[in-house]
Design a protein with these regions (language model features):
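Hydrophobic ligand-binding cavity/cleft-lining segments
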Residues: 1-43
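Residues at beta-strand starts and edge strands
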Residues: 2-4, 56, 70, 89-91, ...
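Short, highly charged C-terminal tails/helix-capping segments
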Residues: 34-39, 138-150
Length: 150
């Protein structure tokens, strides 16, 4: 079973980071990769069963959501090659936040696993997750440096 794992430390308290990313239907914090995020069907961005269509290609379903654990899990039901439903199956992604208590920052981990013999999907999803995490860190870096006076 192929797996990808990516993480980053975001220079902001966990409450601020979670508040920014907790809505399954809001990817405005990731402008370098996500150009559109469409709510598909019924359900809000905080409800298990919510569906989204990213960039007209990635169809995801929210399968677990915890405000307490600051975690969401989703299935990828469709995507572009090399992660299309014809190339991989049983894809589960997880986004999880943890506080870094020594300096009031946030550890963000994003991982996924699926079934497939397709080895191209691993590098593809690593690039996707790295880009998303970089956008998230950059947003808070810009906010902090816009406010700080040194």
């Amino acid at each position: 079973m192929p797996k990808v794992y990516n993480s980053i430390v975001v220079d902001a308290p966990i409450e601020q980071v979670w508040s920014r990313i907790r809505n399954f239907h809001d990817f405005s914090w990731a402008p370098s990769l996500i150009k559109s995020c469409e709510n598909v069907g019924e359900g809000g961005g905080y409800s298990v069963g919510a569906r989204r269509l990213l960039n007209g290609e990635f169809l995801d379903t929210l399968i677990a959501y915890s405000e307490i654990e600051r975690r969401m899990m989703y299935s990828m039901d469709e995507g572009p090659s090399p992660v299309s439903s014809g190339e991989i199956y049983n894809y589960v992604g997880s986004l999880h936040l943890l506080p870094v208590t020594t300096d009031d920052t946030t550890f963000v981990e994003w991982f996924g696993s699926w079934e497939s013999a397709n080895t191209e999907a691993v590098e593809y999803m690593n690039r996707v997750y790295r880009s998303l995490l970089a956008d998230l860190a950059a947003e808070f870096h810009e906010r902090i440096h816009a406010v700080r006076v040194d």
